[in-house]
């Protein structure tokens, strides 16, 4: 008995010592994986489903992944398949995924009065894409306060409409759930009671619901670092960091330009006044959230392809959104502009972009487009479906958006597993997973000579 106890203690110490040797990237990946598996285990239980039956593991895992990775693709209608307990579990998973596993664990550490060590600060900075370690504890507190405060305000603003339609207590719950889902850019809804997988189509012309959801999505998608910059510098725009200026300018452009295109190219059967609301909502939700107020499958292929491009771009660094990020798009555009103007280096807001950032932006674009195309081709082969719906589904999963033409519930198990992997990659980050599998930075003792190669 004593020997068995000693062996177990030795195993425990080996596990603890192994965790101490993990780098920040590995801890982030394992943290998300642990929460996902825990959520899947709970969602499998009969208490989580509305009819009291066991949920197949793949469906429970898919739901847990889409919640933690704040995607929104679902294989079961969230509003009708899951019980109230299941809805609460999904909401907690969304909140955990939106804030980040590291941010939540760090918040509990701060509340307990314990000191945050240097290694913990490094992990915290990496998880929210902070440029430096100084002030990371203050930033974490700011993130939690802003998140909970904005979600509460959003819930209170939507409460009158949902309480009118669903009664007081259920209406308050619906308001809270959709506020958290919108701010975290999850796009998961409970409105299946009005039609399976109907999302927000029953509120397509409701100004209050549309505008509140739009604001929540935008606030969550801009990024905590940007809001911290705005909070500290207020109206002194000249003091903003270059990254904040890039995010704000490109976010505005990516909201209004697609909205204008949607208004003139799509939804022609809707009156002009209501079409403005639908076009604006679809422009905002396409890049990050996954809610929809219109039938996407009835759109033209040009409109569908525009949505694919918007999903690929996604939100901003340090936010709850996925995609290659607005800053990556900005760097790529500035690189092209520099080449056209025959400049030595790309520039934005009177600042030069360092070569390492340019190389990273190119690598991210190559990785996301390659993975998206590979996933789309695989889904098309496995499911015998046209390429456009499969490409839409693939980019939606990889960019953690959650929009779909309605094919997700009909997919086979292999296709569901592929989307699970892609949602995980999209939320954690492709580069994070790559760095997590590498032993460390390789120091080059020497460099090869340079030589030019013809391109273009």
Task: Give the positions of each predicted feature.
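Membrane-proximal intracellular helices of multi-pass ion channels
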Residues: 1-456
């Amino acid at each position: 008995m004593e020997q068995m106890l000693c062996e177990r203690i030795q195993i425990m110490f080996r596990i603890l010592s192994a965790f101490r040797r993990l780098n920040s990237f590995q801890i982030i990946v394992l943290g998300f994986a642990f929460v996902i598996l825990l959520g899947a285990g709970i969602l499998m239980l009969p208490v989580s489903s509305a009819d009291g039956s066991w949920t197949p593991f793949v469906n429970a895992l898919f739901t847990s992944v889409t919640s933690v990775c704040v995607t929104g693709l679902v294989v079961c209608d969230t509003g009708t398949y899951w019980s109230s307990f299941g809805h609460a579990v999904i909401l907690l998973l969304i909140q955990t995924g939106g804030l980040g596993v590291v941010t939540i664990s760090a918040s509990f550490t701060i509340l307990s009065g314990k000191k945050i060590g240097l290694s913990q600060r490094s992990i915290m900075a990496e998880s929210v894409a902070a440029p430096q370690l100084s002030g990371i504890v203050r930033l974490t507190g700011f993130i939690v306060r802003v998140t909970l405060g904005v979600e509460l305000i959003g819930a209170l603003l939507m409460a009158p409409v949902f309480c009118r339609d669903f009664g007081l207590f259920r209406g308050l719950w619906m308001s809270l759930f959709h506020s958290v889902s919108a701010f975290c850019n999850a796009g998961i809804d409970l409105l299946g009671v009005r039609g399976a997988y109907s999302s927000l189509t029953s509120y397509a012309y409701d100004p209050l619901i549309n505008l509140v959801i739009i604001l929540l999505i935008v606030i969550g998608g801009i990024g905590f670092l940007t809001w911290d910059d705005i909070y500290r510098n207020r109206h002194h725009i000249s003091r903003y960091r270059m990254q904040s200026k890039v995010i704000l300018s490109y976010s505005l452009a990516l909201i209004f330009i697609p909205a204008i295109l949607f208004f003139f190219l799509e939804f022609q059967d809707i009156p002009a006044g209501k079409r403005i609301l639908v076009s604006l909502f679809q422009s905002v939700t396409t890049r990050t959230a996954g809610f929809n107020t219109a039938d996407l499958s009835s759109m033209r292929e040009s409109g569908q392809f525009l949505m694919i491009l918007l999903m690929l771009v996604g939100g901003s660094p340090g936010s709850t959104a996925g995609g290659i990020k607005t800053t990556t798009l900005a760097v790529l555009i500035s690189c092209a502009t520099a080449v056209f103007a025959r400049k030595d280096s790309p520039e934005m807001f009177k600042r030069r972009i360092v070569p390492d950032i340019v190389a990273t932006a190119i690598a991210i674009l190559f990785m996301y487009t390659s993975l998206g195309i590979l996933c789309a081709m695989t889904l098309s082969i496995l499911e015998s479906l046209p390429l456009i719906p499969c490409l839409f589904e693939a980019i939606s999963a990889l960019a953690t958006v959650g929009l779909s033409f309605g094919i997700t519930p009909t997919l086979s198990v292999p296709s569901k597993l592929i989307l699970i992997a892609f949602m995980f990659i999209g939320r954690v980050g492709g580069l994070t997973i790559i760095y997590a599998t590498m032993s460390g930075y390789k120091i080059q003792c020497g460099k090869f000579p340079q030589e030019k190669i013809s391109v273009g």
